[in-house]
């Protein structure tokens, strides 16, 4: 979409895009409508032969947002100053709020991944997924359920999970095929 929008915007901002020869009575690549008079909330952008090309407020907002945020490095300083939002704009307030919340999201613990799973025609089970991320190492995921942990606590000789393979050995396709055949 980012790659197509500049082409789309350049076609929209041309002097006149005439689609009336097909009989559609639309302008601006179909976003505007050719009418005798524009409604109160619409703006006249260009002419459609003898009529006006009227564009609704959503299209005007779309164009302004693209010019404001999509092409800041292309426009000169005068145009950028004209398109800057007001200081109390809701978009600026939302952006500041999102940026202030990001550190809190990153600092959440791994217990945030605990889910309650309900399977139809079965008993509900509490499932926790723990992932470890260390640069340069393979990530292993351990999943436990209530029934698994209860059984392992009750048994005196609870076996430990199998040791992960060493990180230096990479599996080859032939080894993967042999393992699949064994299972």
From Swiss-Prot:
- The biased composition feature labelled Pro residues covers 161-170
The signal peptide annotation in the UniProt record is 1-19
Origin superkingdom: Eukaryota
Subcellular location as annotated: Secreted
Disulphide-bridged cysteine pairs: 27-53, 34-48, 38-54
Instruction: Write out the GO biological process terms.
Output: defense response to bacterium
Where does the record place the region Disordered? 141-183
| Record's keyword terms, sorted | Antibiotic, Antimicrobial, Defensin, Disulfide bond, Secreted, Signal
Carries keyword Secreted? yes
**One annotated Gene Ontology cellular component of this protein:** extracellular region
- Tell me, in a sentence or two, what this protein's role is: Has antibacterial activity.
Q: Which family does it belong to?
A: Belongs to the beta-defensin family.
Protein name in the entry? Beta-defensin 129
Q: Which gene encodes it?
A: DEFB129
């Amino acid at each position: 979409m980012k790659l197509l929008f500049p082409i789309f915007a350049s076609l929209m901002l041309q002097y006149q895009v005439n689609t009336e020869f097909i009989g559609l009575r639309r302008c601006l690549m179909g976003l505007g409508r050719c009418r005798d008079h524009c409604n109160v909330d619409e703006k006249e952008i260009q002419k459609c032969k003898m009529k006006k090309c009227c564009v609704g407020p959503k299209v005007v907002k779309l164009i302004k947002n693209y010019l404001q945020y999509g092409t800041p490095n292309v426009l000169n300083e005068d145009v950028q100053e004209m398109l800057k939002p007001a200081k109390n704009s809701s978009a600026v307030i939302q952006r500041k709020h999102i940026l202030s919340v990001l550190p809190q999201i990153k600092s959440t613990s791994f217990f945030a991944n605990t889910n309650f799973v309900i399977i139809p025609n079965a008993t509900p089970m509490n499932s926790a997924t723990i992932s470890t991320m260390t640069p340069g190492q393979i990530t292993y995921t351990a999943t436990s359920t209530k029934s698994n942990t209860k059984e392992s606590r009750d048994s005196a000789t609870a076996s430990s999970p199998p040791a992960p393979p060493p990180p230096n050995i990479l599996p080859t396709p032939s080894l993967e095929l042999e393992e699949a055949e064994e299972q």
